[in-house]
């Protein structure tokens, strides 16, 4: 790929698109400051204060946060749905159990926000998909103080990188590490497992801000579509991946829809 600083036609179009998007977001931020706060995410970000300094975010910081929410939310949502339907097509027994839950709770109607907590197996299906195909393949953290991990001394400022693929498929933590087995996330199994064995959205105060929104959005989409259609692979696919910011299929996953 040509570096972004080389003024090719493609790079110029990308630069223009980024500038247009930046102007769009900054206009929203300026209007909100002049019109007053509302009951939404942007207003929450505007009123948030740094725990150490007590300062609120600058317009530049608000722009960056909004950009992350827009694009990270889109990628995470599409990635989770793609891999979930791929896995369901490979594991029909799981799909049958999911359909039974959807039928029992929704009875053919469109799901609403109040229905999401009443679909525990759907959440297990999503969690198991995220275990096998975590949207973000690695997590990185800078140490703010000296530490020791498993006998290794790590000085302040070290960069610690967690390989989620390895952690999420480690046989010490998962009964069937290479299988699509939503029962990994039933109450008993989850309680017996170290909390840090499953980190698809990160952990701690810097956990993904869009986690709950993404899961809710995907639950509404899955609840609507899975009641009406069965999805099957249109051509063989072995689940090979490539990492381009998020975990994506190496080649498109093409599926056929048939009415239920």
Predicted regions and their residues:
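Cytochrome P450 catalytic core segment centered on helix I
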Residues: 1-55, 59
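Conserved cytochrome P450 K-helix E-x-x-R motif and the immediately C-terminal K′/meander segment
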Residues: 23, 27, 109-150
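Conserved cytochrome P450 K-helix/beta-meander segment immediately N-terminal to the heme-binding cysteine loop
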Residues: 43, 162-190
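Cytochrome P450 catalytic-core helices
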Residues: 76-101, 211-229
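Cytochrome P450 proximal C-terminal region
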Residues: 103-111, 207, 212-260
């Amino acid at each position: 790929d040509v570096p972004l600083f080389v003024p090719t036609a493609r790079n110029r179009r990308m630069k223009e698109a980024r500038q247009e998007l930046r102007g769009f977001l900054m206009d929203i931020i300026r209007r909100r400051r002049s019109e007053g706060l509302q009951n939404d995410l942007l207003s929450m970000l505007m009123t948030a204060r740094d725990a150490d300094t007590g300062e609120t975010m600058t317009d530049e910081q608000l722009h960056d946060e909004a950009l992350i929410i827009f694009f990270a939310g889109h990628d995470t949502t599409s990635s989770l749905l793609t891999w979930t339907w791929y896995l369901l097509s490979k594991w029909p027994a799981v799909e049958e159990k999911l359909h039974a839950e959807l039928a029992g709770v929704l009875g053919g109607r469109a799901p609403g926000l109040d229905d999401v907590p009443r679909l525990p197996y759907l959440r297990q299906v999503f969690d198991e998909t995220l275990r096998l195909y975590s949207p973000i393949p690695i997590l990185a953290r800078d140490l703010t103080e000296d530490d020791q991990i498993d006998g290794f001394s790590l000085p302040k400022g070290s960069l610690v990188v967690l390989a989620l693929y390895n952690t999420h498929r480690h046989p010490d933590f998962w009964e069937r590490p290479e299988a699509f087995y939503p029962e990994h996330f039933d109450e008993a199994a989850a309680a017996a497992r170290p909390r840090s064995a499953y980190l698809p959205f990160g952990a701690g105060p810097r956990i993904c801000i869009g986690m709950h929104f993404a899961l809710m959005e995907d639950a509404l989409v899955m609840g609507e579509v899975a009641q009406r259609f069965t999805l099957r692979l249109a051509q063989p696919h072995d689940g090979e991946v490539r990492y381009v910011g998020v975990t994506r299929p190496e080649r498109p996953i093409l599926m056929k829809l048939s009415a239920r």
